[in-house]
Design a protein with these regions (language model features):
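Thiol-/selenol-based redox modules, centered on thioredoxin-like
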Residues: 120-172
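A short beta-strand-turn-helix
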Residues: 22-42, 63-68
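Sec-dependent N-terminal signal peptides
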Residues: 3-12
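Amphipathic alpha-helical repeat scaffolds
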Residues: 47-51
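Hydrophobic beta-strand anchors of alpha/beta hydrolase catalytic cores
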Residues: 42-44, 75
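Terminal helix/beta-alpha structural elements that buttress the NAD(P)+-binding lobe
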Residues: 21-22, 109, 143
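Sec/Tat signal peptide C-region and signal peptidase I cleavage site
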Residues: 14-18
Length: 172
């Protein structure tokens, strides 16, 4: 009985059995980003960092969002300091992105993406697929039904056909 109760408590606390679209991110601008609001749409979630060699991919993420947002694509940036390459505060991240990239895609507050303290979204992705970001600018595509449709490392650019083919297949 204690084991059953412990499992139920763990699940209720955002355990590994939560689905990716059942999670909530703090928004870098305040408030929250409810992943459930994106049900029925493809969502590309990318862990980002301001001081990384892949930071130039912000341009590609914005271009991807611009190309497909009217058809329903959501691109969500999740700043993270898990690889020691993010700025010291959410305010600094916002300022950096405003000065260097004309981003208007949704952005979460700085979050953990790996390890025991990973955000529940990343724990859910790991539970479903085994995928854990190994560096900044790793990408996870969530299908409109909420399943993980794909994941890619830093070297796969946002506008890569590997990603865009899957996105296009999910859009009206």
């Amino acid at each position: 009985m204690r084991i059953i109760m412990a499992v139920l408590l763990w699940m209720g606390a955002g355990g590994a059995w939560a689905a990716p679209l059942d999670t909530v991110f703090a928004n870098i601008d305040g408030g929250t980003i409810e992943m459930s609001d994106f049900r029925g749409k493809p969502v590309l979630v990318v862990n980002t960092a301001s001081q990384c060699g892949f930071t130039y991919q912000y341009d590609g993420l914005q271009a991807l969002y611009d190309a497909y947002r009217d058809r329903g694509l959501v691109v969500l940036a999740v700043p993270s300091d898990d690889f020691n390459q993010e700025l010291a505060s959410a305010e600094a991240v916002k300022e950096f992105c405003a000065l260097n990239f004309a981003l208007d895609l949704p952005m979460a507050d700085v979050s953990r993406v790996k390890g025991a303290d990973a955000h529940p979204f990343y724990r859910a992705v790991r539970a479903e697929t085994g995928f854990v970001p190994r560096w900044n600018f790793n990408k996870v595509l969530i299908a409109p039904d909420g399943a993980v449709a794909g994941s890619w490392g830093s070297n796969v650019k946002p506008r890569s056909p590997k990603i865009t083919r899957q996105i296009e297949a999910m859009l009206p």
